[in-house]
Amino acid sequence: MLTRSWKIILSTVFISTFLLVGLLNHQWLKETEFPQKPRQLYTVIAEYGSRLYNYQARLRMPKEQQELLKKESQTLENNFREILFLIEQIDVLKALLKDMKDGVHNHSLPVHRDAVQDQATTDVLDEEMSNLVHYVLKKFRGDQIQLADYALKSAGASVIEAGTSESYKNNKAKLYWHGIGFLNYEMPPDMILQPDVHPGKCWAFPGSQGHILIKLARKIIPTAVTMEHISEKVSPSGNISSAPKEFSVYGVMKKCEGEEIFLGQFIYNKMEATIQTFELQNEASESLLCVKLQILSNWGHPKYTCLYRFRVHGIPSDYT
């Protein structure tokens, strides 16, 4: 310990002497008319002397400050990794943009330099931008699975409440007046029949088991179903433990009140893609108008399960 103290003392004396000599030389150089290069050399030496002093100061830095410096360095490293990730994403977006440009290569924007044609140019620009926006939206909103959804509400599908579990009652989803709750605004069951898949826009039911009865837009022979949920990356809570896990699908005969036909049992894997399609294990012998979705478990949420979107695919009765 004594040896280290003497080293620090000697280093401090050396640095102080070095800086003093440098200061005297600097004053002497000012009073003489030496060439510019020796002065530049002195500046470099003085700068390195300052850096050496700072390094020695860091050696004498308290442990708390060293820990703080270490944490700041780790933060900078994390930020650097995030920047690298964003650069990779930019490359992906560039590739997508190229694909978009290829999709609209038939559209061209003429260059007008005549001031009289400015309005015409603006109109063309608006049209081109509109076409590009529509193309982009089609790219992003287009069904990745490319299968007709006969459980789509806008196409005529609906939920039969008599065959559906009760919604989860959440006190946070209630309006109050003078401390008295009078209106719930939780999402209805038919939320799962709509393509608006955003955090919070899901139908929740109590616990990990529940069911919903769906009247399809038309009679079909079901061949597959699709389950969709948000990813953990966009979840406000950072997890999707309320996502469905095991579920079964049944076809219901005779105007949604008759015999149930088992069509298959599946597992929605939250670690895989947010949109997962499952081919039915059993085929119905005739066209069906109603399908029952039975949730058997979720990914660990103790209070409720949340469904974002459920689709039903198949062959219309006109083609059977």
From Swiss-Prot:
Q: Where in the cell is it found?
A: Membrane; Nucleus envelope; Nucleus inner membrane
Tell me what topology the record assigns in the membrane.
Answer: Single-pass membrane protein
User: Which chain regions cross the lipid bilayer?
Assistant: 7-29
Which segments does the entry list as coiled coil? 63-102
Q: Which keywords accompany this UniProt record?
A: Coiled coil, Membrane, Nucleus, Transmembrane, Transmembrane helix
Organ and tissue specificity: Specifically expressed in testis (at protein level).
Q: Name one GO cellular component term.
A: nuclear inner membrane
Q: Which InterPro entries match?
A: SUN1-5 (IPR045119), SUN_dom (IPR012919)
Domain SUN stretches? 156-317
**Perinuclear space topological intervals:** 30-320
What ranges does the Nuclear topological domain annotation cover? 1-6
Assembly mode: Self-associates. Interacts with SYNE1 and SPAG4/SUN4. Proposed to form a spermatogenesis-specific LINC complex with SYNE1 during sperm head formation possibly implicating a SUN domain-based heterotrimer with SPAG4/SUN4 associating with SYNE1. Can interact with SYNE3; the interaction is questioned by missing colocalization in spermatids.
Q: What's its job? A: As a probable component of the LINC (LInker of Nucleoskeleton and Cytoskeleton) complex, involved in the connection between the nuclear lamina and the cytoskeleton. The nucleocytoplasmic interactions established by the LINC complex play an important role in the transmission of mechanical forces across the nuclear envelope and in nuclear movement and positioning. May be involved in nuclear remodeling during sperm head formation in spermatogenesis. A probable SUN3:SYNE1 LINC complex may tether spermatid nuclei to posterior cytoskeletal structures such as the manchette.
Protein name (Swiss-Prot/TrEMBL): SUN domain-containing protein 3
- Species this protein is from: Mus musculus
